[in-house]
Amino acid sequence: MLTVKDIRQHFKDALAREDFVIDKSGVKTIEMVGASFLANEDAIFGDVNWDYVRREIAWYDSMSKKVADIPGGAPKVWQAVASSKGEINSNYGWAIYSSENHKQYWSVMLELLANPNSRRAVMIYTRPTMHSDYNRDGMSDFMCTNAVQYMIRNNDLHAVVQMRSNDVVFGYKNDRAWQHEVMGRLLDDLNSKGDNRYGMGTLTWQVGSLHVYERHFDLIAQ
């Protein structure tokens, strides 16, 4: 399977070839369609802003959909996509923990405790109504993560993240940090609540459109 190193080289090669895709706003992008790789590094390009990651995870844990509740203030990107009420869809903590979305984290944990070999341990982030939910009240937030499947194989917990869209510069770093955090929490819960003891397995990243925007081409060229 491809690794982050391979993905990094793919984008460098595509930039050298000037293999561009023009997005809906007329901006050049480099895109990899149907990407699948081991998310074995924290970042593909650039460095992780761990201070922001911690604040975003705290906001996810709050399950609030209001961007004003992000500790330290909401980044401009969240403000730009929020509704007229300051709300978004993509609070990932709400997606997996909230009773409004069927407490999926707990369903997955209980499934794996009852059947460690299960293929049904899936946390579903998006929903069919996203086609109309994404732009309600002036919002522009079509959730990027589709689902995450968890499997126990060879006594290790593995996760497969399935996304419709992911920016290789900022999106990947923050999303990977969240998914690694959730995977660690699930592992701890399985080990503390069940009779078996598992290790941390692989984190696989699958993306319909893995892309980088023109404004970040300089990071690729480095």
Predicted regions, residues:
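Terminal, non-catalytic protein-protein interaction segments that mediate quaternary/complex assembly
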Residues: 1-222
